[in-house]
Design a protein with these regions (language model features):
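Positively charged, small/polar-rich N-terminal and surface patches that mediate targeting and assembly
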Residues: 1-104
Length: 104
């Protein structure tokens, strides 16, 4: 399993989530975040608003999901965002107590 963390422009959040769900991702977590990229001017207290979308997926879906995100979230403008992928050792559905990929 992989955890995908997608940082996107707020106006592209819904399109990005729709693209992810179209590939078969069951659920997502969404947070409003603020940050500053490495190329941004180092102005104290100035951050840019973004949305963070988090989901955990089966390994075989990873490339399709990354391609879908890139297709809908890219405006070819600085500040489009980032995607981070990390390995997930295990998962637990607290209610059903199912573990592993069946829990996602």
């Amino acid at each position: 399993m992989k955890k995908i963390e997608v940082i996107v422009r707020p106006e592209l959040k819904d399109k990005t989530i729709a693209a992810i769900k179209k590939i078969g991702v069951g659920g997502v977590t969404v947070c409003h975040v603020q940050g500053q990229g490495s190329d941004d001017p180092p102005l104290v207290g100035q951050y840019f608003s973004k949305d963070l979308i988090i989901c955990v997926v089966d390994d075989p879906k990873l490339n399709d999901i990354l391609n879908a995100i890139a297709k809908v979230a890219c405006t070819k403008t600085k500040g489009d965002g980032k995607v981070f992928v990390t390995a997930v050792e295990d998962a637990l559905d607290i209610c059903t107590q199912k573990r592993g990929t069946i829990s996602i």
